[in-house]
UniProtKB/Swiss-Prot annotation:
Belongs to the methylthiotransferase family. MiaB subfamily. It comes from Staphylococcus saprophyticus subsp. saprophyticus (strain ATCC 15305 / DSM 20229 / NCIMB 8711 / NCTC 7292 / S-41). Residues 441-504 form the TRAM domain. GO terms for molecular function: 4 iron, 4 sulfur cluster binding; metal ion binding; N6-isopentenyladenosine methylthiotransferase activity. Catalyzes the methylthiolation of N6-(dimethylallyl)adenosine (i(6)A), leading to the formation of 2-methylthio-N6-(dimethylallyl)adenosine (ms(2)i(6)A) at position 37 in tRNAs that read codons beginning with uridine. Residues 67-185 form the MTTase N-terminal domain. It is found in: Cytoplasm. This is tRNA-2-methylthio-N(6)-dimethylallyladenosine synthase.
Length: 513
């Protein structure tokens, strides 16, 4: 779908701003369709175009002159990357960043819809801004990100949070200048939410957070439709960037001196599958990027279904592709996996793990797990625990199932009592802590290479950073070491971190092309 087609199907509250009625929520309910699994599955047939000509119109260039902005970001790395893009656009409009919310002229809340707790935090944040809006009515408050793509969320804001000036979604960040202008001119709340994704927009300005590590989007959206997940609806179908655009961005980051990049996508393993006539996947992209002078390259998030032997081969070759694989399993029971729509079985997952470990003996495996899924029995949960023992994950992100409106799982009977869910989470977390501590202990007495990222959050006399396998290391050293890869001798292994002694700067170079 190209930009013109996209605009013709967008939700246009802007055109209604001059109407006398103020019942925008009713209007929105009529034109906005809630997530439809049936319709969403058809979307792969629509064409995706690439826009290389993004420019900010000159008439917007001084819009933010003398004004400040603040963006509060919730959620995943993709949201963090979107925040960098929005900061880049606002900077190009003349706005300057501030960390003081009371002095910000524009406040954007970049939201996450993955769990109910994240949404509750956002609504609390919006509510807290009501007092600020009364004191400074000229402040523009905007809500964006994944929550903005949900009908129920937008209607709630329209009805209960009149301090919000504008709402926009994940598909039209590049239209921020136009949306901002409308917010300044309109007396009503501005809502521009695209229910379908648009073109892949290149050349968007970015203000990256720091100059050590960088996010690099390689694709957008997800077509897996796990039954618990809202992301395929809030982020749209899978759209891969062209390899040459990604490689050019990585080369530019190398020239700027970045030490680590993370290739981003809701399902990075599916990279390239949506581009007709391109026999080029994530393994090929990793191999090409391995020839660029970036010391470390990571990728996230992986779906086991699309994890290929080609990827394993490239990671096994070493170089700058780190030996850390985050491979969400979600459950160890086949019946639960089937209800989740995960497309693999316990056996196929373990077979993949075995292939990874065979070819990459030094790999660090981590995962995501959900407990208390609808109809999950004690016996089924026990299979998750035994799978954890079999794989020996070095860490896991664990969650109690959170119902998301609009997903197939939301229609299921959530019949696992909350106290049972909490007990299962506690059991699982004990196992996570046990295996994490075991993984950490093998580093005692060893020298590791640490990318020093800054001072410790707990002690500003201590520096901290991560190993290639994503282990947190704390050590004392001159602050001039920040941004460098250094050698650290590990004196003490803790449950989730390592303490060490600084030895030297690691001046090992990466082979370049």
């Amino acid at each position: 779908m190209n930009e013109e087609q996209r605009k013709s199907t967008s939700i246009d509250i802007l055109a209604e701003r001059d109407k006398k009625t103020k019942d925008y929520s009713k209007y929105f309910e009529h034109v906005y369709q809630p997530p439809s699994l049936k319709e969403a599955r058809k979307r792969g047939k629509e064409e995706v175009n690439y826009n290389d000509d993004f420019q900010i119109d000159e008439k917007y260039r001084n819009m933010g002159q003398g004004k400040t902005f603040l963006i509060k970001t919730y959620g995943c790395q993709m949201n963090a990357h979107d925040t960098e893009v929005m900061a880049g656009i606002l900077g190009a409009l003349g706005y300057t960043p501030t960390e003081d919310i009371n002095h910000a002229d524009v406040i954007l809340i970049n939201t996450c819809a993955i769990r109910e707790n994240a949404e509750n935090k956002v609504f609390s944040e919006i509510g807290n801004l009501k007092h600020l809006k009364k004191e400074k009515p000229e402040t523009v408050i905007g809500v964006c990100g994944c929550m903005s793509q949900e009908e129920s969320v937008v209607n709630k804001i329209l009805k209960s949070y009149q301090n919000v000036d504008m709402i926009f979604g994940t598909h039209n960040i590049h239209r921020l200048p136009e949306i901002l202008e409308e917010a300044y001119l309109s007396k009503a709340m501005v809502v521009e939410v695209w229910s379908k994704e648009g073109d892949v927009i290149e050349n968007l300005p970015k203000v990256r957070e720091g100059n050590i590590k960088a996010w690099v989007n390689i694709m957008y959206g997800c077509d897996k439709f796990c039954t618990y997940c809202i992301v395929p609806f809030t982020r749209g179908k899978e759209r891969s960037r062209r390899p040459e655009d990604i490689i050019d961005e990585v080369r530019d980051l190398a020239r700027q001196g970045y030490k680590e990049i993370t290739l981003l996508g809701q399902n990075v393993n599916a990279y390239g599958k949506d581009i007709d006539g391109l026999a080029y996947g994530l393994g090929d992209l990793l191999e090409d990027i391995s020839k660029i002078d970036i010391p470390r390259v990571r990728f996230t998030t992986s779906h086991p279904w699309d994890f290929t032997d080609r990827m394993i081969e490239v990671i096994a070759n070493g170089g700058n592709i780190v030996p850390h694989v985050h491979l969400p399993v979600q459950s160890g029971n086949n019946a639960v996996l089937k209800i989740m729509g995960r497309k693999y079985t316990r056996e196929s997952y373990l077979d993949l793990v075995n292939r990874i470990k065979t070819h990459i003996p030094n790999v660090a495996l981590t995962t995501d797990i959900i407990v208390g899924y609808p109809n999950e029995t004690d016996e089924q949960f026990e299979e998750t625990l035994t799978l954890y023992d079999e794989v020996e994950f070095e860490h896991a992100y664990t969650y109690i199932y959170s119902q998301r409106d609009g997903t197939p799982a939301a229609k299921m009977n959530d019949n696992v009592p909350l106290d049972v869910k909490k007990d299962r989470l506690q059991q699982l977390n004990k196992k996570v802590a046990c295996y994490s501590e075991r993984a950490m202990q093998q580093y005692e007495g060893q020298t590791v290479q640490v990318l020093c990222e800054g001072v410790s959050k707990k002690d500003d006399t201590v520096l901290s950073g991560y190993t290639s396998k994503n282990k947190l290391v704390n050590f004392k050293a001159p602050k001039s070491m920040i941004g460098k890869i250094v050698n650290v001798y590990i004196d003490e292994a803790k449950q989730f971190s390592l303490n060490g002694t600084f030895i030297s700067v690691n001046d090992k170079t990466v082979v370049t092309q």
